Swiss-Prot record:
Binding site for Fe cation: 54, 58, 124
Cross-referenced Gene3D superfamilies: S-ribosylhomocysteinase (LuxS)
E.C. number(s) listed in UniProt: 4.4.1.21
Protein's name according to its UniProt entry: S-ribosylhomocysteine lyase
Organism: Limosilactobacillus fermentum (strain NBRC 3956 / LMG 18251)
Record keywords, A-Z: Autoinducer synthesis, Iron, Lyase, Metal-binding, Quorum sensing
Family as reported in the entry's similarity comment: Belongs to the LuxS family.
GO biological process, one term: quorum sensing
Cited Pfam families: LuxS
Chain's gene name: luxS
């Protein structure tokens, strides 16, 4: 079975919240795709409940695209501690951390239910499992801790 980088990471050594560049893959024509670890809570110490994580996911899908060029996808980890962000091309972890911080600020302090995309039976595969209240509270908690552009030491972005 192929080795998966995420499963070789020592989850006891990282210091969340942080942004980490996992890999940059190059396609046969030179196209580059970057994969980032957007870790919002400390692994094995906490996990974001599914309804809040689901709402954060739907909001980040649009908010990160507004702040970073080339966003392909932002999908939650099964462990519920953060997200994979996939982009065309490579951004610095500082730029990604700043975009994440700005997006979480928008969620925490400015987002209303009407702003959440994909919350109907037609547009979401689990439309009943959302909580804007939880998304806002978790966003505030994460922002209070600061988002680092380094996974193993705290280097909080402004």
């Amino acid at each position: 079975m192929a080795k998966v980088e995420s499963f070789t990471l020592d989850h006891t050594k990282v210091k969340a919240p942080y942004v980490r560049l996992i890999t940059v893959e190059e396609g046969p024509k030179g196209d580059k795709i970057a994969n980032y670890d957007l870790r919002l809570v400390q692994p094995n110490e906490n996990a974001i409940p599914t309804a809040g994580l689901h709402t954060i996911e739907h909001l980040l899908a649009g908010l990160l695209r507004d702040r970073l060029d080339g966003v392909i996808d932002c999908s939650p980890f099964g462990c519920r501690t953060g997200f994979h962000l996939i982009t065309w091309g490579e951004h610095s972890t500082t730029d990604v951390a700043k975009a994440l911080k700005s997006s979480l600020e928008e969620i925490a302090y400015h987002t209303e239910w009407e702003d959440v995309q994909g919350t109907t039976i037609e547009s979401c595969g689990n439309y009943r499992d959302h909580s804007l209240f939880s998304a806002k509270e978790w966003s505030k908690t994460i922002l209070d801790q600061g988002i680092s552009d380094q996974p193993f030491e705290r280097h909080v972005v402004e």
